[in-house]
Amino acid sequence: MIIEYLYSDVTSLYGDNFNIKYLSSCVKNCEVIYTNFNETPYFVDHKVDLIYMGSMMERYQKNVIDQLMPYKEKIKELIEDNTFFLMTGNALEVFGNNIDDIEGLKIFDSSAKRDYSHHHNSCFLGKYDDMRIVGFKSCFSYTTCDKYPFMQVEKGFGFVNGGNEGIKYNNFYGTYLIGPLLILNPNFTEYLLKQMNVEYKLEYQPTVKDAYDIRLKEFESYKDFKEFKH
């Protein structure tokens, strides 16, 4: 299994890199390719099983878009060919039409608007397929997109225009949920690995599932989640 982690030096703002550390620990002989700025992405000339990018400071988003723009058609081709993509935090905004007046890759019909006077922080409980997904959001930007919903919001906040959160198209998974999403949601991690058709052993059992059950029970106990903004 080959994972390409794009621009890991700037796209692990909330510890998102632990998604890849955990995923790679579950699969024998997993190779992680780290692509930095001004390097040709590995996916351009080689087969990869998963392309990953995590949360970043807003000032780096244009740099990331500029780096990926020459490979836009290749990225679209890989998405259509069902290569797996996982984008956490504001990384998903890169693939939309725009972030304010910054032109995005325009792969998905989404638009993000920043509001630096309104830093959103909240817990999240949602549903994908028959799985409950727990997580956390922290962002200055708000996305409008009514196509290809990933998760249905049960408690918390999704996209601006409805009760959905994230983008799911073919094997592209993009969500505003930050940090070690895969550690927090071992059920989704297992689902992802099964979809990728690789041999795996979910690490740190039963601790990760016990922690998930405790967090899920806690989240279910709240009537709703409030937004903390500063």
Spans of model-derived segments:
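A structural micro-motif
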Residues: 1, 30, 83, 103, ...
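N-terminal beta1-alpha1 cap of cysteine-dependent amidohydrolase-like domains
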Residues: 1-77, 183-186, 190-230
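Short, well-ordered, mixed-charge alpha-helical segments that flank or form enzyme active sites
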Residues: 12-13, 61, 94-97, 114-116, ...
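Conserved beta-strand scaffold positions in the cores of enzyme catalytic domains, especially
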Residues: 32-34, 107, 135-137, 172-174
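Structural motif
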Residues: 50-54, 86, 174-176
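Cysteine-nucleophile active-site neighborhood
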Residues: 56-127
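Pocket-forming structural segment of enzyme catalytic cores
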Residues: 101-166
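A glycine-centered loop/beta-turn motif at secondary-structure junctions
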Residues: 161-197
